[in-house]
Amino acid sequence: VSVVIHSSQFPENVRHDLLQSLRSRQVNHKFHYDSIKQTQKWLALHQVYSPSRTDEDCAAIYDGSFAAAAWQIASRQIHLIGLGCGGGQKDTRLLKLLNEQGKEISYTPSDVSVAMVLVAQQAANSVVAPERCFPFVCDLASPEGVDEIFSNVDANSTRLLTFFGMIPNFEPQLILPKLAAMLRPNDWLLFSANLAPGNDYSAGVQRILPLYDNE
């Protein structure tokens, strides 16, 4: 399996980001998934606690969005780019649906961890031919552009980008302009947002804040 590693994840840049995290006392989210062991632990935790795994209503929301996208995209050729693909389970469900509808599919799983993109690639193996899968390691928060992520997209393919469960890792004012810059006419973006419960945002944040208390 060939994995492309963007310069944002070259050792000198990772070291710079780690030092910046220590100096600012704010750990960059990518260091939660840096090693193989961390990736395995995160995937195990996600499997047990993620609403997309444990809540039928949540899973139905994803499935409904997949069905809507598959129905509305008229192109026969679709290249799915999973931004922050994680273990690739959601992307694989979407790819399976597109495949069942007779679409010619390709897949670029992208994340900050080599281990993570390989897990996603393996998850998609049952649906996407190995020669049509292009694992790509990058840091979307990098000031450098990540246009290389599209290097394997056929000119005749419609680009379908997914951005699932990622927004809590970024400040909106940082990531939203980057997402907008990546999109071109006729692209599609499926984006999940983590919302605080209830109509009172401040009260909703206080309800979920204990979930992030790791002490």
Would you name each region that the model predicts?
Residues 204-215:
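Conserved Class I S-adenosyl-L-methionine
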Residues 1-81, 88-136, 143-144, 148-156, ...:
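Rossmann-like AdoMet
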Residues 94, 179-182:
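Class I S-adenosylmethionine-dependent transferase superfamily signal
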Residues 155-180:
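A short SAM/SAH-binding and catalytic strip from SAM-dependent methyltransferases
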Residues 141-143, 196-203:
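Short, conserved secondary-structure transition motifs
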Residues 137, 162-165, 193-195:
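Short, structured patches in soluble enzyme cores that scaffold and shape functional sites
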